[in-house]
From Swiss-Prot:
GO terms for biological process: actomyosin contractile ring assembly; embryo development ending in birth or egg hatching; gonad development; mitotic cytokinesis; multicellular organismal reproductive process; oogenesis; ovulation; septin ring organization. It comes from Caenorhabditis elegans. The lineage of its organism: Eukaryota, Metazoa, Ecdysozoa, Nematoda, Chromadorea. The keyword Membrane does not apply. InterPro entries: AHD (IPR012966), Cytokinesis/Rho-signaling (IPR051364), PH-like_dom_sf (IPR011993), PH_Anillin (IPR037840), PH_domain (IPR001849). This is Anillin-like protein 2. The gene is ani-2.
Length: 1009
């Protein structure tokens, strides 16, 4: 009969395997068998092992290695960690008594069960151990539980009970049944209970019942009472054989999972590291992969943090101390230990040592660098000991690099990031929330510079690791250049979109806070809340994809201008010569219908009794130019344009003559070049004539818009244009293509690309490699891209018959100077063409328009767009790269809110105020019906271009509606027509009015200052 005895100890028993910290990484472990493991295990004593002690590689403690340690076996750098783990395991076996590895916890005060004598896997825990030890208080072991997840607590009392139950003459070693060496037993792979005795009861039952456990079943089962009752039926000889088969070796926790299918004892080394890739692994194993990271703690953390994570050492047998004193002593040892984090490093000396070590080094079976020099023959006892608690992750080492992350509690975000992409820092402002002292130290410029100054690319170990990283799709980046973990989203066309990985808590919308949010943000939140809720419930949201083709029609072109017309300035259609003929300007009288366009009192109406002397001698406070200076400046611009127009006309005539000669000589290359020059010159002439008309109309305006600041002049470079052809196009007839880019009076074109060289192959894309640069562009510039196409003429070769050859020779004999006379006739023809002789007919350009596209500032980047007005053989999509200069930050801000727009065209014939959603961005106010239209990227209903504003400043209108103001605009509807408009607006409240006036006036000040 089993009898309980009370044995009192003078000191609390030693805790050989303290319970770990609560972490998601405790749910999955695997063990790696190396040569050191076989040498330290008594059952593998016959394995030949090299007993020469070696000095550990101190480079893995160096700050140049980064902030974390990687323990992935195939990736290297694990020799020293393996030595440390072997030492911990060897010391545990030497110091620990012989006891049974039992699988049940209960207190001494717990009443025994009726069948307690038969259950040999009951582990007794003294009450003092639980009450005095802070680790047990933290984990809160409940009474009466048959199953406990943390590591087993082993002490002398449990082993003595088990020895007494078996008899005095029997000596039992550590019980550990390994199904890897028993062919008839099935084993659960990657289980936490495979090597610490928690799955022993299940394996006992499998012996008697001969049942097979599925291989993919990774969830251990609790021992059932039926299984425990059948234990005594197992043959004792069979049990002794199983118990002596393999001993438990703790501490070998790596990233390499165990191999479930091993049939012979000699096959352990063959199956090491045989793990499938991340992409090929199933989701269940991929989820476990996120918990198989072992990272050492930071030794620079505050004392409070180190106290909460104790690290027990390896005490001797005779000195048994209490858990509290043991933890304190180990904490003191770690404080005094020098791990090389604070020592000063000489970059040159460090590189020299690493290169010397690389030249004299070899690689072991784990691809780790091993040095055989005599000075490295040092015992492994000098390796700092690493306990189980220190192996819990306090620094998350992932594939995103060496950036240190704060510990995220389990359950907050357990989503795994399989791929990571480094992102450059955009600012120096680092979020200090949730960072300890170690984080601040690691982000110092000195440490960043130190890590960047060590070129490790020429070391064999690093080259091997880089190859392994490429195989496993790992990314390793320096700490100083990159920050923040990101995920890589793979798109259809091969491009990637970077998205930040954020915590779910940060995605929650914060409540309105008057102390942190501005008035504009608060009002925007209030105004858009009902629309956003309706939009989310409706589910009709639309988000444009950045990878697919998009329409880039600029809203400044298709959006009508807001306001009512007040006056018009039109230029006559008579062009003539600007130097001699006077330009006729007609100022249209204001119609009677427009008299009531603005029923409220305007600024001019309030000051009609004042003198008009200021208007006659108008001086702008922005440009400091008088009206006379402006007129002279406009005249100089017009005369300069007229001279340019004359040169363009001469170029057109030369291109026409060259085209006629190329067609007569049947020279295809010269004909294509002449067609290109003729197309460019004719398009440039149209743009120059339109600009002359615009300047002539602008010269008679009394109050033109003030000039824009020269710092807002932009530049844009467009390159790598690729036009897609129709899929049914098979190049039966050869075509030539050209792309023209137009802005104001300038036009640039690419070279002619023909399909003659690719006549036998089928083409789908036409590439243009030119880089076209535009400078001195306005804030709201728009570049029009047009695609032209022509069919390449195919001339037949002259017949070389005998009659033709004889006729040519006879002709040359009779007329020996025919070639000279033909050249003289060509020169006369060219002179007569220049003099515009009667009967001369200019040839037509064979290039035909087949698609267009509008580009603005928002279309910069590597993008793909749709073409408008597409004709065969184009498919309708174009891909290009564009780079645009940035605007000052003051003009690039956005301001949003609701505004009332006055409109007299109401159905009842009365003036009406319509409520619109307005946005001020880059000097233009856009209007939508509601915020949802803006979010869906719809075309605005109307716009106000502040660069065309003639107001010196926008102020509140007196004697009108509450919170009313107006803006005067000068708009060029056509090149020969300028229209003056007045836009009457009103805000919802006085605060809204003040905010809008400040935003508009600040924009005007920045544009004109």
């Amino acid at each position: 009969m089993y009898r309980r005895e009370n044995i009192n100890f003078s000191h609390p028993p030693q805790l050989k395997s303290p319970p770990p910290m609560s972490s998601p990484l405790d749910s999955n472990r695997s063990y790696r068998w190396t040569s050191l493991t076989a040498a330290n295990n008594s059952k593998f004593a016959d394995t030949p092992v090299k007993e020469t002690p070696q000095k550990p590689d101190m480079s893995w403690w160096s700050p140049s290695r980064g902030d974390t340690w990687r323990l992935n076996a195939p990736r290297g750098r694990t020799l020293d960690l393996v030595a440390a783990f072997d030492q911990c395991s060897r010391q545990d076996q030497l110091d620990s008594p012989r006891y049974a590895n039992l699988g049940r916890y209960r207190r001494n005060s717990e009443p025994m069960q009726d069948n307690e004598k038969e259950v040999v896997t009951t582990n007794f825990i003294d009450d003092s151990m639980i009450e005095d030890h802070e680790e047990y208080e933290e984990h809160d072991i409940e009474l009466g539980t048959d199953f406990y997840d943390p590591h087993m607590i082993r002490h002398h009392r449990s082993s003595e009970r088990f020895e007494q139950s078996l008899g005095t003459g029997q000596q039992i070693e550590t019980i550990h049944i390994s199904t890897r060496l028993v062919p008839q037993l099935k084993r659960v792979p990657n289980s936490d209970y495979a090597n610490d005795g928690r799955g022993d009861m299940k394996e006992y039952g499998s012996i008697s019942k001969k049942n097979e456990t599925p291989i993919l079943d990774g969830t251990p089962k609790r021992p059932s009472p039926l299984t425990t009752r059948n234990i005594h039926k197992v043959d004792i000889n069979r049990m002794d054989h199983l118990m002596k088969t393999e001993n438990t070796v703790a501490g070998f926790i790596t990233l390499t999972p165990q191999v479930s299918k091993v049939t012979h004892k000699s096959d352990f080394s063959k199956h090491f590291g045989q793990e499938e890739s991340v992409r090929a692994s199933p989701m269940s194993r991929r989820n476990r992969r996120g918990t198989q990271t072992i990272v050492l703690p930071s030794f620079d953390s505050p004392a409070s943090v180190r106290k909460s994570i104790p690290s027990p050492g390896l005490p001797t047998k005779t000195d048994i101390r209490s858990p509290s004193s043991l933890v304190k002593s180990i904490a003191n040892d770690f404080e005094k230990a020098d791990f090389g984090f604070h020592r000063k490093i000489d970059a040159a000396e460090e590189i020299a040592q690493l290169r010397k070590r690389a030249d004299n080094s070899t690689f072991d079976e784990n691809q780790n660098m091993v040095s055989d020099s005599a000075e490295d023959n040092v015992s492994n006892d000098f390796v700092p000991r690493i306990s189980h608690l220190e192996m819990h992750p306090s620094v998350h080492m992932g594939i995103s690099g060496y950036a240190k992350k704060n510990h995220v509690p389990y359950g907050e975000s357990n989503e795994e990031v399989l791929y990571s992409l480094p992102i450059k820092k955009q600012s120096r402002n680092v979020d200090r929330e949730g960072m300890d002292q170690t984080d601040e130290i690691l982000l110092t410029p000195r440490a960043i510079t130190m890590r960047q100054s060590l070129p490790f690319s020429d070391i064999p170990e690093e080259r091997t690791c880089d190859k392994i990283d490429e195989m496993f799709d790992f990314v390793e980046v320096p700490t100083g250049d990159y920050d923040d973990k990101t995920t890589l989203e793979r798109t259809v066309d091969g491009y990637a979109e970077v998205k930040s990985q954020k915590s779910p808590n940060k995605m929650i919308r914060n409540r309105l806070d008057l102390s942190t949010n501005t008035y504009q943000e608060i009002e925007f939140e209030k105004d858009t809340t009902p629309y956003m809720q309706e939009f989310e419930e409706d589910g009709t949201g639309y988000s444009a994809s950045s990878s697919g083709p998009q329409f880039t029609r600029s809203p400044t072109l298709v959006t009508p201008h807001a306001g009512q017309s007040v006056a018009e300035y039109r230029v006559s259609d008579k062009e003539g010569c600007a130097k001699t003929e006077k330009v006729v300007v007609q100022k249209m009288s204001q119609p009677s219908a427009l008299a009531t366009s603005t029923p409220k009192g305007t600024f001019a109406w309030r000051n009609k009794n004042q003198s008009n002397a200021a208007d006659d001698s108008f001086v702008s406070s922005i440009s400091n130019f008088s009206a006379a200076d402006k007129i002279n400046d406009s005249k100089r611009q017009i005369s300069k344009l007229i001279e340019t127009i004359e040169k363009t006309r001469k170029h057109i005539q030369l291109a026409e003559i060259s085209l006629i000669d190329a067609k007569r000589a049947q020279m295809v290359v010269q004909e294509l070049a002449s067609q290109r020059v003729l197309l460019i010159c004719r398009e440039r002439l149209k743009l120059q004539l339109d600009e002359v008309r615009r300047l002539q109309a602008l010269s008679v305006v009394r109050h033109p818009p003030p000039p824009i600041n020269r710092h807002f002049k932009s530049a844009m470079v467009i390159s790598n244009i690729a036009i897609h052809l129709n899929k049914n196009f098979n190049c039966r007839g050869s075509f030539a293509f050209i792309v023209a880019l137009k802005c104001r009076t300038e036009i640039e074109a690419t070279g002619v690309v023909t399909l003659l060289a690719h006549y036998q192959t089928r083409m789908h894309v036409i590439h243009f490699g030119e880089h076209m640069h535009f400078s001195n562009l306005p804030v709201d510039f728009v570049i029009a891209m047009e695609v032209y196409m022509m069919r390449v003429p195919e001339y037949k070769a002259p017949e070389k018959t005998c009659a033709a050859v004889l006729a040519a020779k006879f002709r040359n004999l009779l007329v020996p100077n025919s070639a000279h006379r033909r050249a003289r006739n060509n020169s006369v023809l060219s002179n007569r063409t220049v003099l515009s002789m009667p009967g001369y007919q200019a040839p037509d350009c064979d290039f035909r328009f087949c698609g267009k596209l509008t580009l603005d500032r928002d279309s910069a980047g590597d993008r793909q767009f749709y073409l408008d007005d597409v004709t065969y053989p184009l498919e309708g999509t174009v891909k290009l790269q564009s780079h645009c200069s940035s605007l000052p930050e003051a003009i690039d801000v956005e301001y949003r809110g609701f505004l009332y727009l006055f409109d007299e065209r109401s159905p009842n014939g009365e003036a009406a105020w319509d409520r619109y959603w307005a946005m001020l961005h880059r000097g233009i106010i856009f209007f939508w019906k509601n915020p949802i239209d803006e979010k869906n990227q719809k075309v605005p209903l109307s716009q106000i271009d502040l660069t065309k504003c003639t107001n010196q400043s926008v102020e509140e209108t007196r004697n009108g509606r509450d919170h009313e103001f107006h803006i005067e605009l000068l708009i060029d509807q056509t090149p020969s027509l300028l229209e003056k408009r007045r836009v009457v607006l009103a805000a919802e409240s006085s605060d809204h009015l003040a905010s809008w006036l400040n935003a508009i006036n600040d924009t005007l000040f920045v544009l004109r200052s």
